[in-house]
Amino acid sequence: MEALIRAAQEAPSWKNSQTTRYYALVTPEKVEEFSAKCLPEFNQKSSKGAALVVTAFVKDRSGFTQDGTPDNEVGNGWGYYDLGLHDENLILRARELGLDTLIMGIRDEKAIREALSIPENELLGAVIAVGYRAINPDKPKRKTVDDILKLF
């Protein structure tokens, strides 16, 4: 888990604000208890047997001036952007280590905050399962570069 988090924290962040936070559940008992309280049944099944990482970031810092004024219209969106960069590093490192991941955005925020004592000044992102996949799903078809790129 530490190797994954080390890789995650190498990602860039707005003005080097480093607001990403991780909460890892690694013992089978903690994972089972957390899953039952905080994840819908389909995510409980999809992540069975995996460690879980809850992602969050400190709000009102990434994308904000020191006096708390948003730098632009995106505001806390920059915190989510930074969190995504960090999470991608975590996921890529997991893959390098032969581990699989599942990003779960459908979760019970209130239950997660309570279970992990996450402070109100942090906004939650995803719950990421880390382990070994039970199935090999088909990769969805990707759009072509022409569909997503406009050159000027």
PLM regions and their residue ranges:
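A short N-terminal beta-strand-loop micro-motif at the entrance of redox/enzyme domains
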Residues: 1-3
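Glycine/small-residue-rich phosphate/adenosyl-binding loop
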Residues: 6, 10-83
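Small-aliphatic-rich amphipathic alpha-helix that forms the alpha element of a beta-alpha
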Residues: 8-9, 54, 71-115
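Short, hinge-like loop/turn segments at secondary-structure boundaries
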Residues: 41, 119-122
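Structural motif
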Residues: 51-53, 101, 123-125
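Short secondary-structure boundary segments
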Residues: 58, 106, 132
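C-terminal helix-cap and adjacent tail motif
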Residues: 66, 126-152
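Short proline/glycine-enriched turn/loop segments at secondary-structure junctions
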Residues: 114-120, 137-140
